[in-house]
């Protein structure tokens, strides 16, 4: 793998604009038979999403994935979402008790629309077994499996029955896998996405390394159907993290799923904690993301998201910000 690149090394090249206004551009995307306003999903992390925010996102036409760090609350969550006429989208791990949980859902006919198998190194026999188990007991649930970073992994998980794969090993802002283990897609996440997307026959979710709204468009260009974002969604009014004051500024905590803050112990730690500036309402961020993506579509010369997939690009090593600090 020579010649890899990441988000900041790429510029997309404009094509002739065919709209009068960017508001004519449609940012919606369909996944698992459901249509969502944006190809974006907040990360299924404890400081990014909780039940209240999940409900709010679903009510407003956005995709969400509930985290798996309160496993005992999942049955009630599915019932609650379905009771409100909303989709249920949950996460599971691969431990023994998760097998029983899936069987329990099947036995009580509680069928979540989306189930994400969420582990750090998704190219594993454990994940393949879990995909097969879910598909056997809940064949109508859309299964997202991850995380992976290679075409072989994408092929194997798709062949096992995954309906989508999640790509990204350690590129996230609060992920330190790359430092602790020497492995991952940190620093070349966009190239890894492209490499995986070429092998994929089903949707890919790009996960990690997004630092600007332009990175969403770049992810779509290189094959993502959906883009998972953590740090840009952290620190909002609705974010579950604690709000505290540091030097007179309001900040919120944001930590990785494999951090000691998540686990409650220092064992196999591959995540860290940081404080992010309080950003106001998540609604404003979602609207801004949509407007920026509408602009991206207009620069791509189309009216729909797919237009972005066909544009040319250049690799400009570490120069696109011209010294500007954007994050």
Curated annotation (Swiss-Prot):
Please give one Gene Ontology molecular function term for this protein: GMP reductase activity
Question: Does the keyword Acyltransferase feature in the UniProt annotation?
Answer: no
Q: Top-level EC class, please?
A: oxidoreductase
Active site residues per record: 175
Enzyme Commission code: 1.7.1.7
Q: What's the superkingdom here?
A: Bacteria
Question: What InterPro entries has UniProt attached to this entry?
Answer: Aldolase_TIM, GMP_reductase, GuaC_type_2, IMP_DH/GMP_Rdtase_CS, IMP_DH_GMPRt
For this entry, list what GO says about its biological process: purine nucleotide metabolic process
Keyword annotations of the record: NADP, Oxidoreductase
Any matching Pfam family:
IMPDH
**CC annotations in GO:** cytosol; GMP reductase complex
Q: Where do the annotations place NADP(+) binding?
A: 204-227
Question: So what does this thing catalyse?
Answer: IMP + NH4(+) + NADP(+) = GMP + NADPH + 2 H(+)
Q: Which family does it belong to?
A: Belongs to the IMPDH/GMPR family. GuaC type 2 subfamily.
Q: What does this protein do?
A: Catalyzes the irreversible NADPH-dependent deamination of GMP to IMP. It functions in the conversion of nucleobase, nucleoside and nucleotide derivatives of G to A nucleotides, and in maintaining the intracellular balance of A and G nucleotides.
Would you tell me the protein name for this molecule? GMP reductase
Q: Species name for this entry? A: Lysinibacillus sphaericus (strain C3-41)
Gene expressing this chain: guaC
